[in-house]
């Protein structure tokens, strides 16, 4: 029963931190350490992220199906650029063993680095603009690859 309560707490942490420019994975790692949850690898994080994905799909299902032209998304460059931006993260995920970074010591430093990145990006936000093209989609994908690390925020990137 205690384990169930711990995982409910982790689910709440995931839900509260996913849509802010903080690392939900990093916070999950920290709270697993605080709650003394023995989790080998990233299984709890993966399950929590699938829960987030499921809730997002449910949330946006209504707006997608109420769209006047459902084919717009699939006939625009959006799907193409979304695929391009995913490629670097997939390659990094296949090449590197990220599970070694799911520990309290690494996360504390990556959360600190993430905070500095967010401050720097907020200062630079008006100095450049990206147009959606192959190069910018690939660049976005490279930054998202860095965000695979726990403690680095995907939305902060």
PLM regions: where:
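Multi-pass membrane proteins that catalyze or facilitate reactions on polyprenyl-/lipid-phosphate substrates
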Residues: 1-157
């Amino acid at each position: 029963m205690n384990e169930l309560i711990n995982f409910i707490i982790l689910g709440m942490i995931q839900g509260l931190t996913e849509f802010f420019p903080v690392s939900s994975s990093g916070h999950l790692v920290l709270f697993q350490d605080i709650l003394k949850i023995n989790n080998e690898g990233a299984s709890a994080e993966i399950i929590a992220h699938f829960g987030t994905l499921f809730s997002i799909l449910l949330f946006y299902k209504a707006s997608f199906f109420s769209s006047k032209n459902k084919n717009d998304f699939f006939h625009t460059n959006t799907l193409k650029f979304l695929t391009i931006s995913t490629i670097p993260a997939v390659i990094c995920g296949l090449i590197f063993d990220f599970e070694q970074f799911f520990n309290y010591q690494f996360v504390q430093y990556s959360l600190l680095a993430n905070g500095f990145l967010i401050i720097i990006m907020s200062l630079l936000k008006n100095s450049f603009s990206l147009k959606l093209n192959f190069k910018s989609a690939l660049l976005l994908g490279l930054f998202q690859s860095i965000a695979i690390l726990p403690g680095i925020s995907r939305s902060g990137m």
